């Protein structure tokens, strides 16, 4: 009767030890022996090594998760700072527009005030020169009248002039009602 060993072939019973020339069977037996020796001697070390590797991987994953959470938190902080900066920039822009508008209004008001002062000065200047012109005309007319009076006085008074002056005063007396 034959007994099958791992489907590798038929081994006769009770024949004892001998040289097995089937390379495939011997390789499997050798491999099984090596695996058994490795597992028995290296098994604990290998399982410890695998456990250390598992712990390292778990720690790396936890650290990566923690770093990701920290990065997310820093990102949120940066986003908040960006929003604050945008609000501040908007406020600064609005304040700049407000100040520019205010400055323009101040300049316009100052310009209008200067224009009104210039208009007032112009009116005063025109009035001054009008008064000066009237005064010069008045002085000229008075000087002409005075020169004509002097001429008349120097020439002497003739009879017709006496009659005109006397008639003037007589007419004034007749109009007088006390």
From Swiss-Prot:
GO molecular function: proton-transporting ATP synthase activity, rotational mechanism
Localization terms from the record: Plastid, Chloroplast thylakoid membrane
GO cellular component terms given for this protein: chloroplast thylakoid membrane; proton-transporting ATP synthase complex
Record's keyword annotation contains Signal: no
Domain of life assignment: Eukaryota
Matching InterPro entries: ATP_synth_b/b'su_bac/chlpt (IPR002146)
One Pfam family hit: ATP-synt_B
Keyword Cell inner membrane: no
Disulfide bonds: none
Transmembrane feature ranges: 23-43
Topology relative to the membrane: Single-pass membrane protein
Key words of the record: ATP synthesis, CF(0), Chloroplast, Hydrogen ion transport, Ion transport, Membrane, Plastid, Thylakoid, Transmembrane, Transmembrane helix, Transport
Assembly with partners or alone: F-type ATPases have 2 components, F(1) - the catalytic core - and F(0) - the membrane proton channel. F(1) has five subunits: alpha(3), beta(3), gamma(1), delta(1), epsilon(1). F(0) has four main subunits: a(1), b(1), b'(1) and c(10-14). The alpha and beta chains form an alternating ring which encloses part of the gamma chain. F(1) is attached to F(0) by a central stalk formed by the gamma and epsilon chains, while a peripheral stalk is formed by the delta, b and b' chains.
Note: In plastids the F-type ATPase is also known as CF(1)CF(0).
Protein family: Belongs to the ATPase B chain family.
Reported function: F(1)F(0) ATP synthase produces ATP from ADP in the presence of a proton or sodium gradient. F-type ATPases consist of two structural domains, F(1) containing the extramembraneous catalytic core and F(0) containing the membrane proton channel, linked together by a central stalk and a peripheral stalk. During catalysis, ATP synthesis in the catalytic domain of F(1) is coupled via a rotary mechanism of the central stalk subunits to proton translocation.
Name of the protein this chain belongs to: ATP synthase subunit b, chloroplastic
Organism: Tetradesmus obliquus (Green alga)
